[in-house]
Amino acid sequence: MTITLGQSTKNDKDLFDTMDDWLRRDRFLFVGWSGLLLFPCAYFALGGWFTGTTFVTSWYTHGLASSYLEGCNFLTAAVSTPANSLAHSLLLLWGPEAQGDFTRWCKLGGLWTFVALHGAFGLIGFMLRQFELARSVQLRPYNAIAFSAPIAVFVSVFFIYPLGQSGWFFAPSFGVAAIFRFILFFQGFHNWTLNPFHMMGVAGVLGAALLCAIHGATVENTLFEDGDGANTFRAFNPTQSEETYSMVTANRFWSQIFGVAFSNKRWLHFFMLFVPVTGLWMSALGVVGLALNLRAYDFVSQEIRASEDPEFETFYTKNILLNEGIRAWMAAQDQPHENLIFPEEVLPRGNAL
């Protein structure tokens, strides 16, 4: 009997193993299994947005011009939401609304649902990409966990809020000025700035910016491997590859400034992660509340007193009047399908009008 030693020539790999080898191969741009979701969805979302902002009008859904072809610029062009009459239809190209007609589909606002859905799955694919790469190189998954915060905000604003309202019409359109209009709408109809979840979101984002600036400045300040420059700014190279800053010096500095300071890098960086991520999560929860038409803080006693005493006014009562003005002006313009007509005497007029 002859026994052959050595590697078997038989290929025992199945299709899954072959795909896994190719997808996770070490290359310039990692693909991975998450890439099967990320790259097509990101391509279609961006492609749909560029197509819509270049060619597609919003005349049939909002009564607006919204494309470069109609004279808009980068700040005013948008892929706008479908009409309110279409409610929560997915507006599939082959669905009963468009019936396979691409031009009709664009006129109805089909590009908005196309961009929103592919954008959401693209963002989820990017988060899964971070999970997959972290597992491959044996890192913790905190990058992916942090990225869940902007995903939560996107999903709550573009999907959950309009699902709680009468249709996709009340979601933000994809454009700069369109997002600004949506913010004004949120303020006028929901008093969003006085919502505690919005306050937590603002504290998280601005607090994170402050922490980031302080952290970057402190690291630059405490580099101890210097050059031969004549002054502090020339002597330290901000692109120095080695980590040569002094945590002890930084701790002593901030202890003298504030009386307290971070004692180790882990707690410091966890705090820098915690502040913005928690703020964005809280904002997303607040938007879910708005989908259910939950109210912000109401100081009714001040409103009653202001209505009875013409000499009593607070910043709160002034803002409530401002919100009423936003509603009166926006409702007729923003919801033309309702045919709202307000008498001239109820519309707020400023000095410029």
Swiss-Prot record:
GO terms for biological process: photosynthetic electron transport in photosystem II. GO terms for molecular function: chlorophyll binding; electron transporter, transferring electrons within the cyclic electron transport pathway of photosynthesis activity; iron ion binding; oxygen evolving activity. NCBIfam families: psbD (TIGR01152). This is Photosystem II D2 protein. It is an enzyme of class 1 (oxidoreductase). The chain crosses the membrane at residues 41-61, 125-141, 153-166, 208-228, 279-295. PANTHER family: PHOTOSYSTEM II D2 PROTEIN, PHOTOSYSTEM II PROTEIN D1. Chlorophyll a ChlzD2 binds at H118. GO terms for cellular component: chloroplast thylakoid membrane; photosystem II. Belongs to the reaction center PufL/M/PsbA/D family. 2 of the reaction center chlorophylls (ChlD1 and ChlD2) are entirely coordinated by water.
